[in-house]
Amino acid sequence: MEIMEKAKILEAAGRDIIYLCLGEPDFPTPAAVVAATHRALDAGATSYTPSLGLRELRQEIVHHYRKRYGVHLEPEQILVGSGTSPLLLLLFAMLLETGDEILLPDPGYACYPDFVRFAGGVPTRIKTTAQNGFQPRPAEVEKLINSRCRGLLINSPSNPAGSVLSGQELRTLAQLPIPIISDEIYHGLTYEGEEHSILEYTGSAFVLGGFSKAYAMTGWRLGYLISPLTCARTLQTLHQNFMICANHFVQLGGLAALRHAEADVERMRRLYDLRRRQLLK
């Protein structure tokens, strides 16, 4: 964000800037989402909602995972929040005591280590290479597991490498004796092969998902955390104490995205892929 702010100053001074610092779509939010949010505001959807999020939205997320991945969830497993970042922070607050470790891919999203440290934990980096797709391999992860290790964070499709873990790779990682935290915010933007969720292979993982990337809704700040039922109430309690709930009308926009914007997502995905292919020529 600091780099972007400096770039904005240079742009205002007349410099021609190409932004490579943020994973932000350059498409507008789908019209159906904007229209639904206008209607929600006109109807007075400006109150608190349940801290887990609107049940209708959570049920639609359940439907989305069943349709896309064949995964069966309960609405109570889903915590809707104002973006995935605060939800990840709450998750680390639940998992970590001072000095506990979280295993992180390196390279990886620059904010991951800060979230771990803020919760009192120690970020332990797993060095990855181009040969393994810049993704952690089970053998390397196992070497780093110790009595203070509280989880492995994976990101597929990944930031910054863009690499994707295969179904078999996810299946193997799911067998590790530590919780898997899967950041799936870039799901919907895969260009080759099949897209899989860690939830296809284990019911004990934590999954971060949202609307920012695939639906071009970065500024709306809407995401969700899927957790095992045994952890859902604790996460809900943390959320209602620190954040209360996500914005009511924004949640209704997210509902419209899931119900009416899949064609927009596919159109944007095809255009991203076209740009990618042009860049690689």
For each of these PLM feature ranges, what is it?
Residues 100, 121, 176-179, 203:
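A short helix->loop->beta-strand "cap" motif at the edges of active sites that frequently abuts
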Residues 1-83, 90, 257-260, 277-278:
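N-terminal small-domain helix-loop-helix segment of the aminotransferase-like
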Residues 94-116:
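Conserved PLP-anchoring active-site segment centered on the Schiff-base-forming lysine
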Residues 72-78, 98-101, 148, 203-204:
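Short acidic capping loops at alpha-helix termini that bridge into adjacent secondary structure
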Residues 124, 128-193:
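Active-site phosphate-binding strand-loop segment of PLP-dependent enzymes
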Residues 201-273, 277:
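Conserved core segment of the aminotransferase class I/II
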Residues 118-124:
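A short helix-loop-beta submotif of the ANL/AMP-binding
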